[in-house]
């Protein structure tokens, strides 16, 4: 009788441990660490980072250049060794800031076009002229996600966080 009780005890303990282990694995989290459960970033920084990282944006190293407090900000268009980058690739600005993209003349003809997942819509002409500029004033909070369409495959992407 004593052996049966010990067996039942071991069996019962094992079942309890297994149930507790499975319960811990059965949570509704998605494992991405952002806590919103849908796999999408829930912060402007997260949206910009995911967009730039997923698209292998040139000159993006994970840093977002803080340009808050500035009325006007310049983003170099045609930056980098091959002229296929925006510099800086990611910036943070205040509502009301005007961002000016200025062409270097390197890397061929460029444009600046918002992507469908962007909170803003804008599109420049496709130009290869050094010194050409395109301006966009951001009057609302949000995230501008953009690309140079001729150089999408080369990783020419950028982001503006407006707060």
From Swiss-Prot:
<dbReference type="GO" id="GO:0009055">
    <property type="term" value="F:electron transfer activity"/>
</dbReference>
<keyword id="KW-0732">Signal</keyword>
<feature type="binding site">
    <location>
        <position position="151"/>
    </location>
    <ligand>
        <name>Cu cation</name>
    </ligand>
</feature>
<comment type="function">
    <text>Electron donor. Binds one copper ion.</text>
</comment>
<feature type="lipid moiety-binding region" description="S-archaeol cysteine">
    <location>
        <position position="25"/>
    </location>
</feature>
<dbReference type="GO" id="GO:0005886">
    <property type="term" value="C:plasma membrane"/>
</dbReference>
<protein>
    <recommendedName>
        <fullName>Halocyanin</fullName>
    </recommendedName>
</protein>
<feature type="domain" description="Plastocyanin-like">
    <location>
        <begin position="48"/>
        <end position="163"/>
    </location>
</feature>
<dbReference type="GO" id="GO:0005507">
    <property type="term" value="F:copper ion binding"/>
</dbReference>
<feature type="binding site">
    <location>
        <position position="156"/>
    </location>
    <ligand>
        <name>Cu cation</name>
    </ligand>
</feature>
<keyword id="KW-0449">Lipoprotein</keyword>
<dbReference type="InterPro" id="IPR000923">
    <property type="entry name" value="BlueCu_1"/>
</dbReference>
<feature type="region of interest" description="Disordered">
    <location>
        <begin position="26"/>
        <end position="48"/>
    </location>
</feature>
<keyword id="KW-0479">Metal-binding</keyword>
<feature type="compositionally biased region" description="Gly residues">
    <location>
        <begin position="26"/>
        <end position="38"/>
    </location>
</feature>
<dbReference type="InterPro" id="IPR028871">
    <property type="entry name" value="BlueCu_1_BS"/>
</dbReference>
<dbReference type="InterPro" id="IPR006311">
    <property type="entry name" value="TAT_signal"/>
</dbReference>
<keyword id="KW-0472">Membrane</keyword>
<keyword id="KW-1003">Cell membrane</keyword>
<feature type="modified residue" description="N-acetylcysteine">
    <location>
        <position position="25"/>
    </location>
</feature>
<dbReference type="InterPro" id="IPR008972">
    <property type="entry name" value="Cupredoxin"/>
</dbReference>
<dbReference type="Pfam" id="PF00127">
    <property type="entry name" value="Copper-bind"/>
</dbReference>
<keyword id="KW-0249">Electron transport</keyword>
<keyword id="KW-0007">Acetylation</keyword>
<dbReference type="InterPro" id="IPR017533">
    <property type="entry name" value="Halocyanin"/>
</dbReference>
<keyword id="KW-0813">Transport</keyword>
<feature type="binding site">
    <location>
        <position position="148"/>
    </location>
    <ligand>
        <name>Cu cation</name>
    </ligand>
</feature>
<feature type="signal peptide">
    <location>
        <begin position="1"/>
        <end position="24"/>
    </location>
</feature>
<feature type="binding site">
    <location>
        <position position="110"/>
    </location>
    <ligand>
        <name>Cu cation</name>
    </ligand>
</feature>
<keyword id="KW-0186">Copper</keyword>
